[in-house]
Amino acid sequence: MDESKKNERLQQLTDIQYNVTQKAGTERPFQNEFYDNEAKGIYVDIVSGKPLFSSNDQYDAGCGWPSFTKPIDEAEVIEHRDLTHGMIRTEVKSADADSHLGHVFPDGPQDKGGLRYCINSAALRFIPVDKLEEEGYQAYKKIFE
């Protein structure tokens, strides 16, 4: 992502969006926008706009954050070992904007690969299926057909 465009986008973020994506912050569980979203659509990186997750892969993990079994395209997320807070975890960042998204854990549904991508709502923008074309994401409509 072009640095000037990234800086422009960063200036448009709310405090919580900036804290989560740029300072690896975490939202409060059950008090965020998408933890219980049941609408069909895709979730894009709040900074770069790159598609990251689909509602088709979202499930209720009971953790209080949006949870997904997989990204739309694995190339759009980067995983790093995270040793903060006295834990060993795997951090998930967006490949294009290097935004902190959340963490991935090996306790997801076994029949869908066994992973749980636990992602902060503040790192995401939701595009409903009926707005995909209008927002420039028409290529992703096929996911829902």
Swiss-Prot record:
One MF term in the entry's GO annotations: peptide-methionine (R)-S-oxide reductase activity
Gene that encodes the chain: msrB
UniProt-listed GO biological process terms: protein repair; response to oxidative stress
MsrB domain: residues covered: 6-129
Pfam family, one: SelR
Alphabetic keyword roster: Oxidoreductase
InterPro entries per the UniProt record, alphabetical: Met_Sox_Rdtase_MsrB, Met_Sox_Rdtase_MsrB_dom, Mss4-like_sf
PROSITE patterns: MSRB
Name of this chain's protein: Peptide methionine sulfoxide reductase MsrB
Catalytic activity annotation: L-methionyl-[protein] + [thioredoxin]-disulfide + H2O = L-methionyl-(R)-S-oxide-[protein] + [thioredoxin]-dithiol
Class in the EC hierarchy, top level: oxidoreductase
Enzyme Commission number: 1.8.4.12
Active-site residues from the entry: C118
Keyword Oxidoreductase carried by entry: yes
Disulphide bonds in the chain: none
Family designation: Belongs to the MsrB Met sulfoxide reductase family.
Key word Transit peptide present: no
Gene Ontology CC: one annotated term: cytoplasm
